[in-house]
Structures are given as C-alpha cells and as structure tokens.
Amino acid sequence: MGFSSLLTTCRYLLYSGAGNSFILGESMPSLEDVLFLCQEEMVDGFLCVESSEIADAKLTVFNSDGSIASMCGNGLRCAMAHVAQCFGLEDVSIETERGVYQGKFFSMNRVLVDMTLPDWKKAERKLTHVLPGMPEQVFFIDTGVPHVVVFVSDLSKVPVQEWGSFLRYHEDFAPEGVNVDFVQRKKDDLLLVYTYERGCERETLSCGTGMLASALVAADIFSLGQDFSIAVCSRSRNLIKIFSEKGKVFLEGPVSLLNRSENFGWLEPKSRRFG
C-alpha cells in the first residue's frame, strides 16, 4: 500500500474536528511534550498515530492534562482523515484502546466513523445532591468514555464551567469521574450540546463522544425509533450528524487541517513517518 506522510517536512500537525482541536504526531510523545504542546497551542489533546498490525493505523489519544483517553470521537475522525490522505484511502480502520473502529473519508467536510459499541451502559440516575437550579435527573452512558447527559430548557442560562466541574467530580460517579453534556432540544432532530470534558477540566468547543451520548439518550427518551438521524450543534457552531442504521451508530462531520509545525514558531521542522 502506498504511503505518503503529511509530516515529511514538519513534526506535528494541528487539526480541528468540528471545533475540537488537536496536535497530531506520528511518534509517542513524552508527558512533558503533551503538556507543553497542548498548553502552547491551547488545544484539547494530542493524537499519536502509529503503525498497526491489525488496522491501517493505531491511535493513542492524550488529554491536555497528559492523561490517556480510551476514546475521542472527533480525535478519531481527525486521525482517520490524516490516515486516509497518507494512504489514499476512502475506507479507513483505526486501532484504539477500545478496539478497531471503521470509518469512511469522503472529504475533509465529511469524515464518518462507526461508533457502535455492544453495550452503551445507559442508565437514568437521580443525583444524591445538586447545585441550586440543577436538574436532579441525569443520564449516564458510555460512548467509549463515560458521559453524564443533562437536559435543560435554556442552555444560555447554564453555568457550564461551574456545573460541569461539580458533576465531573460528583461522588455518584467516583472515582473515575465523567464527562458532562448539557443538552437543549431545539427541534425533533436538532440538539444544542455544551460539554465539560474530563482530562481538559473545562468546557471544550466540541466533543464527539459527548454529542454522540446526547443523541443516543435523546433518541431513547423522545422515542425517535431504532433508525434515527440527529444533527448536533456544539459551542463551535459546527454541526455533527449522528445517525443509526441497521443497528449501527455513526458519527459524521468536518475535519480541518489548521497548521503545520514549521509555522508554529517554536519547533524545528523534522521529517517523520509512521509505518
């Protein structure tokens, strides 16, 4: 299979997956590198794309605090776009901590991944204690990483940082903690979602697994049927499409290549290939 790395003249690339921003490299970074790079570029994480014996490539996702995330939906789509362009592929497979994910690269505006898991571990929960004005009923779901979905009537009135931090460390979800998604239903097939991400410890402009979690819970509680299609808008105002078809659930949206490390100003270009 022919391979042409996008990193032949630089060490890192800066990607955005519908507003989720990442540094991408093709060798395993040190913890110090992850912390420095994420802080310097103010990004949500580091994507390490390497060779795989069971897929087109292997992806390791680092949160901006240096911890490893078992899954990142928008990061996975960025990695798929990167690998698709390196190998000249349309169908792409990526090995992750949660198994091998299959995706399809149509264009940078349309990168799709099959996010189906055998068990989403969905459960409605009543919180043991809440902050003033916060709903008591929430929904837990695992879309590769754990999420708590909170439906509200008006997202503009939600203090995302305060409520998000409170729920992320809530004793009901200890010790691992959760990502927190605040959701407003705009139409039958349109959700507005703001996410506080574990590992970033703040609200991010977009979160693929959070948008997926919100759509899956909405499909259940609003009885949208087994085969559904929901558009999800994040803080970045990018739209992600979540749809179910023949028992599988897909995440689809745009990916952008924002910058290369020779333009970052603080790195020397260095050739690097995985494989």
UniProtKB/Swiss-Prot annotation:
Gene3D superfamilies from the UniProt entry: Diaminopimelate Epimerase, Chain A, domain 1 (3.10.310.10)
An example Gene Ontology biological process: lysine biosynthetic process via diaminopimelate
Pfam family, one: DAP_epimerase
Keywords assigned: Amino-acid biosynthesis, Cytoplasm, Isomerase, Lysine biosynthesis
E.C. designation(s): 5.1.1.7
Transmembrane segments: none
Primary site of residence: cytoplasm
Active site per database record: C72, C207
Signal peptide: none
A Gene Ontology molecular function term of the record: diaminopimelate epimerase activity
Subcellular location: Cytoplasm
Subunit structure: Homodimer.
This protein's name: Diaminopimelate epimerase
The organism of origin for this protein: Chlamydia trachomatis serovar D (strain ATCC VR-885 / DSM 19411 / UW-3/Cx)
Protein encoded by which gene: dapF
